[in-house]
């Protein structure tokens, strides 16, 4: 989390995930080629991501993503309880013209389709499995926000509030004069599985 998958346009000198992976590869083989991007993750997301060792593999993997054949599974901790608790959601999205780098629902936008399934409900939050069928920017985050249960700690599509122990354990007291520290303050979203041909 906190590292871009690829170089950022506005800060091309900042280390990205490709640079870090390449540095690692070069410790074993100084002549190792630079990794190739197959897909991207949001900067605040941690989990499974694919890179290719050479251009031929990149082209083959990217074609699979264009054909929508990889099976992607995400798990997310969300605010509240999604309604309905399972199903498919199809909407249309576009980049938000007033907020660069974010998306919004728009009838004329690109199709965004996801399947979702409630795994566990808690008092104030839920654990949900999401299987995106398309590959839109912020797709899982938008899907959950559309269902009325944005991803925890999502500052763009949700409240952005961190998870506090006092939310779950009413008797919790951080101590006199101490401020309660969050149990989790980063985006509650993780890609957990990608199934593809390789």
Residue ranges, per PLM feature:
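RNA pseudouridine synthases
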Residues: 1-198
